[in-house]
Amino acid sequence: LTTPNGLGLEDNPTRQLIDEFGAKISIHLLLNTVITRHCEIIKAYAGHFIQAHRQGIEHAKTVYSVPITGHADITISSSYPADIEYWQGLKGLFSAALATKQGGGILETTPCPEGVSVMHPQWIEYLQYDTATLKDFLTQGKVEDHVAFGLALNVAHIREHHPVFLIS
């Protein structure tokens, strides 16, 4: 249930499920765009849904990726511009986890003016648990919001490898 952080990896379990589903429903064409933070199109790719997606990824890496030459003892991260609520602010945490040494600390800053999660109120309850407890909830059928559960499981996994501090 807990896999390594898939951020920036085109071959991750979620992507595999999407590609499998796309093949089942016979998607014939995908128009994939790489955009700026102001939603301006930089480049567009069209064609087979997997190939157009992968081409877009390769271009997006040149625009949005930052090379990391080593892992930090402490990483300070901002969620900007995804900071309306903590649900969105996690993008900063996931990026920081990739840049931080095992056991190293993460300090995330995010304003979250709308709180933790407007659309997934149960998520705040899930966030208090470790991965073992969350997995027990799943096997016992106690999970109502599977999207919130999955994200809480990812956060728990990061917290088990890094002390995390949030300033909001």
Q: What are these language model-derived features?
A:
Residues 1-71:
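Conserved, well-structured core segments that form the ligand-binding/active-site neighborhood
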Residues 41-47, 87-88, 118-122:
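Short acidic, glycine/serine/threonine-rich loops at helix termini
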Residues 90-168:
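C-terminal non-catalytic interaction/assembly regions of soluble proteins
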Residues 79-89:
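Short, glycine-rich nucleotide/cofactor-binding loops
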Residues 13, 87-92:
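Short, glycine/acidic-rich beta->alpha junctions
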Residues 73-78, 107:
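Structural motif
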Residues 34-36, 79-81, 110-114:
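Histidine- and/or cysteine-centered catalytic micro-motif in compact active-site loops
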